[in-house]
């Protein structure tokens, strides 16, 4: 009897439950996958959005919407008046920022709303556009797919290929808040009817544009950051006279498989010295000249070692020239000598530019491929 009464109560409760209420149809939802911002000539914020379209009657798979506003929060209301459907938050994949905007202002203040709303996606990738943001957003993608998906896949595949960095919105915020490192962002540009990852954008401590790195320099940046999640590809032009070959054939390509770094920092009479010793294990991917590897492998190791040091030294000097620290050297200084770090914390970029940085790699070839 008790079981029967309990069953009746359960069925009565189920009958009174209203369920999910009004049905939600995907055709009426608008998922914003890409935000893009730049400043116009009047210093107004121009915002572009790419949202997916699921209607069977639509000819395009996504819609680009443009608004001119003072703040990103204000753009939400204007978007709602232009997009037919409900704007669903939490699906953002990419945030594009015009380089011209970074050259004028700290963009973090404009992105403030994205950090405050818990519904927003803070794992979206932050990308700098070298050129017109409008050109990128209105590029024809009929043979490539939906714009938001194309940008996300391009950025993540180039990072996996280790020729650019990958900075999420959350990571960008952390870099901006940490005085021991300066931000580095993926850089992209439009070439004819293609989107190309051209390298990495470096920012000052105040969030303004400092300089750009090409793809080779971006790979070296990952080495100096000790970011070894995947093999890092590098191609070097080695001294032709050492290997008795022509200049146009004196190339070798490698993958850095492992790297173990030892950082030491010291202050002497207020002058900072950073010593970096790095053991690097590589595999030979390409060699365009003849060489007896059994007898001359050490010669090749030394040549690659010297070229790696030369290019890393040039990259460090480039960062020092612009008073930026995308490598995170400041993190090591802070952890090893906190007392002296507090003296330079507020002007770390300038302090690094005046410091002596010694980079000493030790290269070992662990694989030469099946052809040897």
Question: What kind of region is each of these model predictions?
Answer:
Residues 2-372:
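Membrane-proximal alpha-helical signals and transmembrane carboxylates
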